[in-house]
């Protein structure tokens, strides 16, 4: 195994023309590592469309009287015209409908989370030990194929559909967690923010597209086609993934010598070798790791609240109909998709030009993202009379929140690249924990008092996010921790 000193020595032996070629790979987007970011962008896009498609399709899948009663309970002004369109569409498309109670619908929508909560840590460990190519690829393939079979499973019975969704949740975690083991091998430190944010922006784009097109697909083609279309897109992504993606640049058959050398030399100071053992005791005692964990939980509390209740807030408080609610709910994700990439580019620019240190960049982007996004949400209850002002605040909150993806949310790769897959799995558990608790608490507040409930929801989410920020600012670091380095042995 090559050490950092060996790699430095080899770098010194590189001829000047090769060094010039190597320098050229520091600029531009025509490289295999950026190609990997684009493919992962498509993978994340596919996974998030598959996560959200049932939320839209279930309105058309259930008996219209059940759907109508749910709609009347969740909005102040039921959009009767939109409901008539749904009824006409169901009759014309002849898609099957089911007499699922609200309780069964809730279990179906939650079943994906059951699998997602179980799988992250073992998935991250397996990806870190055996490599991420087949972990991510198989996860995407399984999730996509199961998406295609959802209409058949629904016909077979609700129990089979629940089991299918649990397995699908586990498969999706394989993609969302395992990909970070790839970045530990492929992302030079000075490009880490932009590469990861390009890939992560696929989740925003997927959410945006489902919010925009999900209802239209169900209306025009029938609800089964929302599963056929997005499941088919996922299968198509697998055709790109397996032949083009490799676990590391050393084994990639199509990479140029210059790019391989640039990535290898850039990562020479970091120990990215795969390891079987986990320094659990050292991890538990590591305050920089706890800073990331706490920040993850608190930031996802705010994010989960916004994602879960933005459509409800727009429909009930702003009294938008179904069509307008979908379009307006998609706007924050559209702008967030763009700004998450711009934030990554800005972070890497500040680092490559040595304007700021890496730890300063991580703390600065996290602080701006948390303070601005949470602060903008606080006045929402007082501007509810203006739809344009409310939407402007929601969009701005999403824009600033995207900066955290270049801050605390990728900081674990800085402190322990060797255990990137395992740590991402651990952090996913805390994010799912926040995602399970936050909407429940928000629902309790809103049910108690519709006017002051929203105010309490936003204040609580902002307060939790700021507390997490303070903990992160105090204890976070950006250098590789001692427990994340490969042990060295002295031979006498």
Swiss-Prot record:
InterPro entries xrefs: MFS, MFS_dom, MFS_Na/Anion_cotransporter, MFS_trans_sf
Pfam family, one: MFS_1
Subcellular location: Apical cell membrane
Parts of the chain that traverse the membrane: 112-132, 134-154, 156-176, 198-218, 225-245, 287-307, 327-347, 363-383, 393-413, 426-446, 456-476
Region annotation (Disordered) ranges: 1-20
Record key words, sorted: Cell membrane, Glycoprotein, Ion transport, Membrane, Sodium, Sodium transport, Symport, Transmembrane, Transmembrane helix, Transport
Topology of the protein relative to the lipid bilayer: Multi-pass membrane protein
Reaction(s) the record says it catalyses: 3 Na(+)(out) + phosphate(out) = 3 Na(+)(in) + phosphate(in); urate(out) + n chloride(in) = urate(in) + n chloride(out); L-thyroxine(out) = L-thyroxine(in); 3,3',5-triiodo-L-thyronine(out) = 3,3',5-triiodo-L-thyronine(in)
GO molecular function: symporter activity; thyroid hormone transmembrane transporter activity; urate transmembrane transporter activity
Biological process per Gene Ontology, one example term: sodium ion transport
Glycosylation sites: 18, 44, 53, 63, 72, 87
Expression across tissues: Expressed in the small intestine (at protein level).
Top-rank taxon, per record: Eukaryota
SUPFAM superfamilies linked: MFS general substrate transporter
GO CC annotation terms, alphabetical: apical plasma membrane; brush border membrane
PROSITE patterns reported in the protein's UniProt record: MFS
PANTHER family: SMALL INTESTINE URATE EXPORTER-RELATED, SOLUTE CARRIER FAMILY 17
Family statement: Belongs to the major facilitator superfamily. Sodium/anion cotransporter family.
Role according to the record: Acts as a membrane potential-dependent organic anion transporter, the transport requires a low concentration of chloride ions. Mediates chloride-dependent transport of urate. Mediates sodium-independent high affinity transport of thyroid hormones including L-thyroxine (T4) and 3,3',5-triiodo-L-thyronine (T3). Can actively transport inorganic phosphate into cells via Na(+) cotransport.
Protein name (Swiss-Prot/TrEMBL): Probable small intestine urate exporter
